[in-house]
Amino acid sequence: MNVSGCPGAGNASQAGGGGGWHPEAVIVPLLFALIFLVGTVGNTLVLAVLLRGGQAVSTTNLFILNLGVADLCFILCCVPFQATIYTLDGWVFGSLLCKAVHFLIFLTMHASSFTLAAVSLDRYLAIRYPLHSRELRTPRNALAAIGLIWGLSLLFSGPYLSYYRQSQLANLTVCHPAWSAPRRRAMDICTFVFSYLLPVLVLGLTYARTLRYLWRAVDPVAAGSGARRAKRKVTRMILIVAALFCLCWMPHHALILCVWFGQFPLTRATYALRILSHLVSYANSCVNPIVYALVSKHFRKGFRTICAGLLGRAPGRASGRVCAAARGTHSGSVLERESSDLLHMSEAAGALRPCPGASQPCILEPCPGPSWQGPKAGDSILTVDVA
């Protein structure tokens, strides 16, 4: 087997057994192929939904977009190469990719963890201080934060460009750690602290305070409003994504800590644990689109619309478009818009009715004919694509 991945894996082939047929040489690449397929399709759809119609204009959407970019880069640039360490006897991709692949693994891992920490702070400010945080929670500041995220990610992952190198080992060309053990241990500890421990602490603190505020709101009217329900929905979705990140990357970091500070003998059992930690951590890059599809009605509609367009079918029911008279504009995240008072009232109506004037609640309705008279002055027309 090829030598790559976590510290202490230098004798992975010996741990996996001698000659003969290795089941992991078939099973693991198939699982990596599944991760690659689901992750590529899912994250591409997420980016398409957010970019379609200029919807990535809120701070939350920009952070979700950045998370999708990091996951897609990881899937495309890392997973195919890492899958070969269980099938090929040596590293066949050259010295440059030996360094670049591992650098990209840690670059995207840092970017994902920093993005989740940033979006947790964004959700806390949006819910706890909705008015005072408006000047801070702007698309421009979100883009600046994303730039800072990638800058810090480059800073912390840059040393991995020299951490690994291609060399000859037992008549095989392998890609393995080149640093001395003390330097590798210091680097791995720094990676654990800055890419996992600190972001997890930020996530835990912000979401604990956010959930406490949401579920202990003293104003029953505000607590039952559509805006509050929308904020709860988007917070729940981001919380699930953050929890999955913590759980999926935990085995990877636990294994590394065991290598440096515990007992990690090279046996078939520890070899299986190493494979499992790889699969679980890499699978994190393909689960987020599944979470979005399960939690967000907007993403489900967007996925169906894009897939229907690719298949050459007209998406939607009946006319495929609906109209609504709404006062003002909506600038929140995709989840907040879909859970706004407008949509809650339309669902409660149970049937489609003509759009009333501005003095009455607005209900989604089929697009009327030319004889329909528009809303009064001061109202605006909101056109919604229905998948």
UniProtKB/Swiss-Prot annotation:
Keywords: Cell membrane, Disulfide bond, G-protein coupled receptor, Glycoprotein, Membrane, Receptor, Transducer, Transmembrane, Transmembrane helix. Pfam families: 7tm_1. Disulfide bonds join C98-C175. Residues 1-28, 82-99, 163-187, 259-260 are extracellular. It is found in: Cell membrane. GO terms for biological process: adenylate cyclase-activating G protein-coupled receptor signaling pathway; adenylate cyclase-modulating G protein-coupled receptor signaling pathway; cell surface receptor signaling pathway; feeding behavior; galanin-activated signaling pathway; inositol phosphate metabolic process; learning or memory; muscle contraction. Residues 50-60, 122-141, 209-237, 282-387 are cytoplasmic. Its main location: membrane. Expressed abundantly within the central nervous system in both hypothalamus and hippocampus. In peripheral tissues, the strongest expression was observed in heart, kidney, liver, and small intestine. SUPFAM superfamilies: Family A G protein-coupled receptor-like (SSF81321). The chain crosses the membrane at residues 29-49, 61-81, 100-121, 142-162, 188-208, 238-258, 261-281. It comes from the Eukaryota. One of its GO terms (cellular component) is plasma membrane. Signal peptide: none annotated. InterPro entries: GAL2_rcpt, Galanin_rcpt, GPCR_Rhodpsn, GPCR_Rhodpsn_7TM. Gene3D superfamilies: Rhodopsin 7-helix transmembrane proteins. Glycans are attached at N2, N11. It is a multi-pass membrane protein. The keyword Secreted does not apply. GO terms for molecular function: galanin receptor activity; neuropeptide binding; peptide hormone binding. Belongs to the G-protein coupled receptor 1 family. Receptor for the hormone galanin and GALP. Receptor for the hormone spexin-1. The activity of this receptor is mediated by G proteins that activate the phospholipase C/protein kinase C pathway (via G(q)) and that inhibit adenylyl cyclase (via G(i)). This is Galanin receptor type 2. It comes from Homo sapiens. The gene is GALR2.
